[in-house]
Structures are given as C-alpha cells and as structure tokens.
Amino acid sequence: MTLSLDLLLGFALFALVTSITPGPNNTMLLASGVNFGFNRTIPHMLGITCGFFVLVVAVGFGLGAVFQTYPLLYTVLRYVGAAYLLYLAWKIAHSGPMSESQQSEAKPISYLGAAAFQWVNPKAWIMAIGAISTYTPMQGYFTNVIVIAAVFAIINLPSVGVWAACGTLLRSVLKDRRWLRLFNWGMAALLVVSLYPLLLESFS
C-alpha cells in the first residue's frame, strides 16, 4: 500500500484537528500571545513545529519500538513531562501584569525550549504515534515517514499560530490587572487539567 491521495487527505484532516484543538502547546501559545505579543511568540511556534517534526520522524524510525521493549523508559519520560508541565503552569499562573521595561526583559519560551518540550508533551506523543501507526503505509515506509512528518509540520505551524494570534488579540481586552491575572490562572489550570489522562492511567 502506497501513500495515496485519499490516505494523504485523511491524514491531513487528522493533522489539522489534532494540531488546532486545545492542548499544552496551544494553551501556552495563547498565554504567550497575551503576555508577549505575536512577534515574540514566533520562536515558540517554530520550536513546536520543528520539534514535533523530529519527534514524528524518530517515532517512525523506531523509537516507538524501543519504548515497547523498555516500557520503563516511556513511563519515566511521561512523568518527567508531567513535572515540567506543572512547572510551566506555575510560571504562567505567577506571571502578572508587566510594565514596558519588564516586558522587554521578560523572555517567552525559546525555540529550543519549545522544541525540547515536544519530547515530554503527552499530546505530541499521542499525535506522533497515531500518525505513524494509522497513516504510514509499509511500502516505501521510510520515505512515507518523512512525507507524513513534513505534511504534519506544514499543517501544524499555521494551526498553532492561530492560538498565538488569538492571544495577541486578547491583549487589549486584558489590560486590566485583575483580568490578566484571572486569564493566566485559567491557562495554568488548563495545563494542569491536560494531565488528566496520565492521572487516570496511573490510578486505574
């Protein structure tokens, strides 16, 4: 089976839905758009897309099989990711209104930081494994992995950009200190809530 047009279109829809729906990346981009603006959030966006591209390729080239052989590695990675996500939620919750000088000194998540985060992002792993296991034909497998990863990246970048843009549009609405604090606490809470699948699995 080759990567037909029908299969590619089906995958493109999968990539769009999973990229644009809420998750840790998009929640952080929305908060970054509000706190730093769109332009300063661009490295964060590019880091997400490039880091995710590498993750999909790695899963396709055998990293998934390594985790099946050594499940403890995957478990450790997931809990490290959960701990990092809680740290990011804490940072967002405590990022209050800033003066112009404070905004210039404060730093949004960097390109490398966003790229590295994909390796501990539970939703990114689910997306990558789903793409490889469901939409990658075995005939011409390695070429298809690259195509799948590239198409995912092409769709992912504008999808996550929508969230950063929405955050930027909200800046004028959230000039009031109280509303901005409530917004940041809300975004932090959503990040914590995004860990519920891991918690359910841990206690099941």
What are these regions (language model features)?
Residues 2, 196-204:
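Juxtamembrane boundary at the C-terminal end of a transmembrane helix
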Residues 157-172:
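Transmembrane alpha-helical segments of integral membrane proteins
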Residues 40-110, 166, 173, 186-189, ...:
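Membrane helix-loop-helix hairpins that form the core translocation module of multi-pass transporters
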Residues 118-123:
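Selected transmembrane alpha-helices and immediately adjacent juxtamembrane segments
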Residues 2-75, 127-152, 162-164:
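Juxtamembrane transmembrane-helix termini in multi-pass membrane transport proteins
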Residues 88-92, 155-161:
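Transmembrane alpha-helical segments that form the membrane-embedded catalytic/substrate-channel core
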